[in-house]
């Protein structure tokens, strides 16, 4: 193959140009993302049961839906929540690779089976089935510059004019409004109702009748008279629009003829539909919209589309309304990808300098350099063909590939240069001879490296998706690299290189010094190798000790899934004691805001707080803050990193009285949770009941708090049981008094909850009408006695006449996991520990809890557990496949052993570098380790291949052959290894956006390659001789 292209250099150029053109077109069309679709697809079912408490919602809605979600293809796990606001949410998580569209259809079909069993009020509200991510992509906040709009004005405008257009934007899965649009609020006065012998149901029924749209038909409608000349629509009644019009609704006419109007028994106003959240931006009134990504959508494209849509809508905003983005995860994605591109360029420059140092010939150096863009662009074309994106993983694969792909070209050029110098041949003839010598080695390297990375493509789950990105990228670049090394590179060598001048090349002073030093080093290396081969037994014992050290390092290196990143944003939760009011929560959130904007003013750009909302549930005692940091370029230094900021905040905010305030970083993969660290579900497997499960949870939290050196920040991601005021209705007594139980229930529900009646028109938009007790009549326990219900004889009877009240406790939010009552526990690993260590520790603590209490991992922790289970199998399969590939290539069982024995030398270097830097055995490390395995084998192949050839063609003994092969291949091995090490150096020293992942990949690979090079050049001859002697004895036996 190589000879064909040596004789046809134009054809080689044509193929290279076609590859580059295809890659250039691919880059222009490939979408950009931080990660591929790693997170498994999720489908969320949401339902509302107005006025119901959490237990009622769970019993009558959540469980009914859950029990019908059986037989769904690819369902991994299911979690659900039921809260005191009447909301039920069931999130179904499917295996990676499942079509979200098909999953959504299947869930909808199953939901239809559950519908007849659900309460009528739930069916009337409607049930949504969304395929959106559970995590927030970005938050758009809206503020009034001059304060002319209050928070309700802002929220109404956002809900009426902005929310719907954003929800229709491409890539948006769902939107969540922090605020509420206006509604017509009817605030009832129980004393006035009692005065006029009225109950809330009378008010509701009259609003329904008098605020109604009636279709009146037509005058002259078809069929019509033959001479009909008139056709017009009949308008009977339209919906009311103003508080004044509602106030005039007629409730009853008394015996004296006087009328009782709605305004006589209630205060009517235009108020908020929902008062459950209070939003602030840097302490000022605001409203906000949280954007959640549609499953499978591209984050960058969606963010751009949202901002473009808001920019379009801003032309119609009220004069003082302004949009800000207090939380946006996409700048991190853009900058981290840019950083990897920058690293790619730096790697190419460093590799060029290394090659020039060793080759000392610009013509020779330019040949491998030309191969870099050809192979990289060709790889982009393949990525486009297989449906990949430009993301952190594929770009890391490119950076690793630079060192690999120049290896092939360097081996070709270096050998051609050697043949030209030693055999005094013209470049073309030298290239023909050289390719005959190394063609098999190039194929062997390609086969081995492909064999190393191929098993990664078949792993499952989110980890498997990460492995696949690396696998396809590296294999594609490797195969293209070998193709270029056997087509374009030899063609360039034959046409660009010059014959050696008489007396050889005369290097400049720097190169002369380098060559002198290198020749001395080569001679010293040759002598050392000869000495080593005299006492191979001693060095095999040393090798075994290195293997033992490798095993120890493997056991002591902490495990995790993915490294944490400084994403430029983080969150802070605030939870007050049960029963705390919104007033108290707002004060605490203001303290949080003041801290970040004063104590961390050099690092923090903005703070957006939402009272009444949190990932642990909705409630007046819950709050959440979105903190946006200044750009990375303005936060240089470890003390200004997100980790340091969070650590300082955790200490400072812990002093806030009567509140638990907890700042936390975002997870590495947004769709796999809301916080970094571990995510555990404590399960009531034994059906012990809510109270026993709560006790077990508290015991677990107490045990965890006793070991701050293992775990920290261990907390429940839920709401504590709160005091509840229970009304016990004596049904028999009520019946005896002629009071219907349904009337009692509706009176209580309307007064202390609210009743949605129907809709009205406001500024051209349909909005809702609610009836509820006025504020003074639902604040205290005694207010229950102010309400009356009319009996069958028309007499008003107070609720106190047939009911009693008592205080009790209950949960405002109940959780379930896979159909079992559960409680979510979040936490972080202590300093110096990994999430893997923390997970193992927490699992041991759960084992100490009462029988019947179990656990399961969810979100990111679920994927980490899956990853740790797959890693040993991945290593084993890769090693076996490499061994078999070498055996097939060399038609020998002994040669593969000589090559494979070098693998632990690279592994120990990777482990040592990772351990010394305090990093973890995560997915990136595992990818780097496989790369190290391949590169270690590659160096061994370069030596062994030449030794075998000398034994077969020149009849040399194994010792003579391996010494000569080691001497000949030392220069290309050191050159390619140093090129690779310097190629990944930018990853190792990276800081800022995306540096966590870059450090994790680069450190292990660099350490592994360094050890594989320094140790392998001495140990490979030992392995070769030992294996050859053992197999020779075996054959004689």
Curated annotation (Swiss-Prot):
It comes from the Bacteria. It comes from Escherichia coli O157:H7. The gene is mdtF. Homotrimer. Part of the tripartite efflux system MdtEF-TolC, which is composed of an inner membrane transporter, MdtF, a membrane fusion protein, MdtE, and an outer membrane component, TolC. The complex forms a large protein conduit and can translocate molecules across both the inner and outer membranes. It is found in: Cell inner membrane. The chain crosses the membrane at residues 10-30, 339-359, 370-390, 393-413, 442-462, 472-492, 535-555, 871-891, 893-913, 928-948, 973-993, 1007-1027. Part of the tripartite efflux system MdtEF-TolC, which confers resistance to various compounds. Residues 1-9, 360-369, 414-441, 493-534, 892, 949-972, 1028-1037 are cytoplasmic. Keywords: Antibiotic resistance, Cell inner membrane, Cell membrane, Membrane, Transmembrane, Transmembrane helix, Transport. InterPro entries: AcrB_DN_DC_subdom (IPR027463), Acrflvin-R (IPR001036), MdtF-like (IPR004764). This is Multidrug resistance protein MdtF.
